[in-house]
């Protein structure tokens, strides 16, 4: 009886299609894992029982402050210090290597189970989708109204939030589609937050 030497997680167009295992007759102390999504590739070696912890988590206060500061500097004509949002591709999601991903790309986790990451700098080669955060709000009705002023439609997604994407879209009175992206999630302090983004 052999053991697994390699794991290949293959996604096409953001959908996980195959999980391929390479086994041989040797005993292995570590397993080579390769996550592929179209042209994106992320590889690492997994040692049994080894798991990279998540980096510092973002609480709602930090997130709102960073988002507000970026927006204020843009309105004042000063060079903006934008906030970027990163969503791993389907293969990374299947592999569950979020701590390693964040460490390798210098990102902070938005929340413990959100699987979304933020940074003040744009990261080249990130395996997944990248967005610039144009605004952030709690679920406070007035804050949401100000955040979504003039936006009639958006692509809505939720991560670690008690509402489905359809429920959130209805609550926000948005049509599906357009070039705006709305992410609903839970920050590290347990606050439900809404991020308004543009895809890069």
Predicted region positions:
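SAM-dependent transferase fold signal centered on methyltransferase-like domains
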Residues: 1-200
């Amino acid at each position: 009886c052999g053991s697994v030497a390699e794991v290949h997680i293959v996604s096409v167009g953001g959908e996980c299609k195959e999980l391929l295992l390479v086994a041989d007759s040797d005993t292995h102390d570590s397993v080579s894992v390769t996550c592929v999504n179209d042209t994106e590739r992320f590889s690492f070696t997994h040692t049994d029982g080894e798991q990279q912890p998540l980096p510092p988590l973002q609480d709602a206060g930090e997130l709102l402050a960073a988002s507000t500061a970026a927006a204020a500097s843009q309105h004042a004509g000063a060079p903006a210090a934008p906030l970027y949002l990163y969503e791993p591709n389907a293969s990374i999601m299947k592999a569950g290597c979020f701590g390693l991903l964040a460490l390798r790309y210098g990102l902070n986790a938005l929340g413990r189970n959100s699987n979304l990451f933020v940074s003040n700098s744009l990261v080249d080669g990130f395996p997944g989708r990248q967005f610039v955060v144009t605004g952030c709000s709690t679920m406070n009705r007035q804050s949401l109204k100000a955040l979504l002023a003039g936006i009639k439609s958006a692509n809505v997604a939720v991560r670690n939030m008690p509402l489905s994407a359809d429920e959130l879209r209805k609550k926000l009175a948005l049509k599906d589609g357009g070039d705006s992206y709305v992410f609903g999630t839970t920050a590290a302090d347990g606050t439900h937050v809404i991020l308004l983004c543009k895809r890069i």
